[in-house]
Curated annotation (Swiss-Prot):
It comes from the Bacteria. It comes from Fusobacterium nucleatum subsp. nucleatum (strain ATCC 25586 / DSM 15643 / BCRC 10681 / CIP 101130 / JCM 8532 / KCTC 2640 / LMG 13131 / VPI 4355). This is Co-chaperonin GroES. The lineage of its organism: Bacteria, Fusobacteriati, Fusobacteriota, Fusobacteriia, Fusobacteriales. Together with the chaperonin GroEL, plays an essential role in assisting protein folding. The GroEL-GroES system forms a nano-cage that allows encapsulation of the non-native substrate proteins and provides a physical environment optimized to promote and accelerate protein folding. GroES binds to the apical surface of the GroEL ring, thereby capping the opening of the GroEL channel. Its main location: cytoplasm. One of its GO terms (molecular function) is protein folding chaperone. The keyword Cell wall biogenesis/degradation does not apply. Keywords: Chaperone, Cytoplasm. One of its GO terms (cellular component) is cytoplasm.
Amino acid sequence: MNIKPIGERVLLKPIKKEEKTKSGILLSSKSSNTDTQNQAEVIALGKGEKLEGIKVGDKVIFNKFSGNEIEDGDVKYLIVNAEDILAIIG
């Protein structure tokens, strides 16, 4: 799939949380809160002014209730507005 966001939007690939605790206990999908995950990798950018400083490959934290989900086979992506990106990790 070749998706290019337009305007001040960003295509993100959510980063799955570790489903094991530090002590090695495996968590069920219900207890790991995967539905509220809010970290992702930037896959593509639009051309908006608010995107300054964000690059493809950056790891970001975004508003967990934002964006539109898109699926490509088994891979899930999100398209979010630039203002929904809260921070760059690293």
